């Protein structure tokens, strides 16, 4: 249990996908103008990462990994060259299901997210989470915790940035820094804040 708690804390704070690895910056910067919209996208990312990482873990370890098809009578089979294609397909399917669910049950959030909801499919934060799971050889339980933790970390980062950007509307920002300029500085400062967790050993 302690291992899972440590993994979750590490995924949220120490190895934050947005602020440590700078993954998913396109949607991170574009949808962080309002806290409500940022929170909605953050929840969507948590759901997609929380499902896609463990599902891809099962597919990789039971079908794609070298020797994984021993149960089917093919002990020498190695389908790992298909992993990227498979991972993207699974992520796309999950995002499509989420998109249909939001359109039906939360149309206001669906309309607010607009084009950025289907863009979660190609959001490198989602693919990065899945790739890290394979690289670090997580088991199924660890992949569930890592997927949810990575999603929570990304959501926390985008909501924090959205809160700062909402306050910046009332700030006297120099003309040359308005828009993305002050946003990049804000992201850097939030990232520096999260760097303080890098000294934590778990």
UniProtKB/Swiss-Prot annotation:
Cysteine pairs bridged by disulfides in the record: none
MF terms in GO: oxidoreductase activity, acting on NAD(P)H, quinone or similar compound as acceptor
Keyword Cell membrane: yes
Segments traversing the membrane: 11-31, 39-59, 81-101, 114-134, 144-164, 180-200
Endpoints of the signal sequence: none
Reactions catalysed: a ubiquinone + n Na(+)(in) + NADH + H(+) = a ubiquinol + n Na(+)(out) + NAD(+)
GO cellular component: Gram-negative-bacterium-type cell wall; plasma membrane
BP terms from Gene Ontology: respiratory electron transport chain; sodium ion transport
Enzyme Commission number(s) of this protein: 7.2.1.1
Annotated compartments: Cell inner membrane
Pfam family, one: Rnf-Nqr
Keywords: Cell inner membrane, Cell membrane, Ion transport, Membrane, NAD, Sodium, Sodium transport, Translocase, Transmembrane, Transmembrane helix, Transport, Ubiquinone
InterPro entries: NqrDE/RnfAE, NqrDE/RnfAE_oxidrdctase, NqrE
Membrane topology qualifier: Multi-pass membrane protein
Family membership noted in the UniProt record: Belongs to the NqrDE/RnfAE family.
Known role: NQR complex catalyzes the reduction of ubiquinone-1 to ubiquinol by two successive reactions, coupled with the transport of Na(+) ions from the cytoplasm to the periplasm. NqrA to NqrE are probably involved in the second step, the conversion of ubisemiquinone to ubiquinol.
Quaternary organization: Composed of six subunits; NqrA, NqrB, NqrC, NqrD, NqrE and NqrF.
Protein name listed in UniProt: Na(+)-translocating NADH-quinone reductase subunit E
Organism: Idiomarina loihiensis (strain ATCC BAA-735 / DSM 15497 / L2-TR)
């Amino acid at each position: 249990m302690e291992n899972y708690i440590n993994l979750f804390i590490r995924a949220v704070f120490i190895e934050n996908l947005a602020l440590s690895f700078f993954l998913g910056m396109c949607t991170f910067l574009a949808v962080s103008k309002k806290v409500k919209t940022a929170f909605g996208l953050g929840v969507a990312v948590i759901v997609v990462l929380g499902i896609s990482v463990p599902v891809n873990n099962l597919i990789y370890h039971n079908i794609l990994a070298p020797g994984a098809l021993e149960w089917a009578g093919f002990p020498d089979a190695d389908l790992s060259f298909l992993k990227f294609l498979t991972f993207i397909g699974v992520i796309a399917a999950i995002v499509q299901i989420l998109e249909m669910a939001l359109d039906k049950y939360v149309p206001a959030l669906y309309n607010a997210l607009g084009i950025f909801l289907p863009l979660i499919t190609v959001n490198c934060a989602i693919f990065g989470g899945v790739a890290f799971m394979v690289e670090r050889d997580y088991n199924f339980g660890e992949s569930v915790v890592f997927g949810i933790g990575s999603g929570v970390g990304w959501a926390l980062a985008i909501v924090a940035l959205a809160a700062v950007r909402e306050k910046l509307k009332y700030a006297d920002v120099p003309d040359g820094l308005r828009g993305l300029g002050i946003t990049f500085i804000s992201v850097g400062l939030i990232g520096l804040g999260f760097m303080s967790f890098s000294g934590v050993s778990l």
